[in-house]
Every structure is written in structure tokens, then in C-alpha cells.
């Protein structure tokens, strides 16, 4: 376990490699095609959630909070961008664990992981995560007049909620 100043090598070991371990996410996405799929939908929805991180559960909370805001607007999350701000004395193993966890969450929820950025500051005491979820409005929830219809959940449907 290494502690100390954040460096390029630490970024490669703790951020890039855990993402590459998840093969589907390591392939990335077709730069022009997938962006076009998101942008050509009728209504784009963007949501952001920021929190301090002390455990993996905090990452899940930020992830689902951003995704649920898109869902609350009758949308479907397609892409997630994540930004970390680490204290200077962060443990590399903790950084790697959290980065791998966000990649696993994206794979579990069938959401593309678009961009992961990280920075270091002497002004933060705990890690800070910012999750930006991008999605589009789901047309299945509107009728011909554009008014919302009340839909009931089917058996076996998954509903995720975060406070």
C-alpha cells in the first residue's frame, strides 16, 4: 500500500488499470456513433451528484442519485462521467478500489462509463466524487398529446431509489 503524493504512475495503477480490467468498458465506445445516439434523442437530461467519499457505499449513493434524477424526469441513463478529487495523502489501494467499483456499477446497470478524471488538492480532507449522468427522455411514458401517462411497474422490474 503506497501513500504520498499523487503521480502519473499512481494514476495509471489506481485509475486506468481497474477500468481496463472490466473488458466491456475497456473497449470504450465509438466516439461519433454513441454521442450521436445520445444527442439525437428528443430530450436530453443531464444530472450531477457530488459528495465526499469515505467508503464504497458513498460512490454507489452518488451514482444512483445522479441516475435517479434522470429516471425521475422519465429518462434513461446512457452515459456516466466521473470526476475524483483526492487529498494529497490518499492511499493508492483505496483509489484503485473506488475506481474499480464505479466501473463495476456501470457494468451492472448497463451504463457506459464515458470519462474518469482525477485530481489532487491539499485543500480537501476526504475524497470528493462528482458523477454526471447523461440520458434521454423515454418516449414510452407519453401519449400522442405529450401528456404523461401513469404506468404501473411490471413484476420483476427493478426500481432503484437513493436519498
Put a short name on every predicted segment.
Residues 39-77:
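Active-site cofactor/substrate anionic-group-binding motifs, chiefly glycine-
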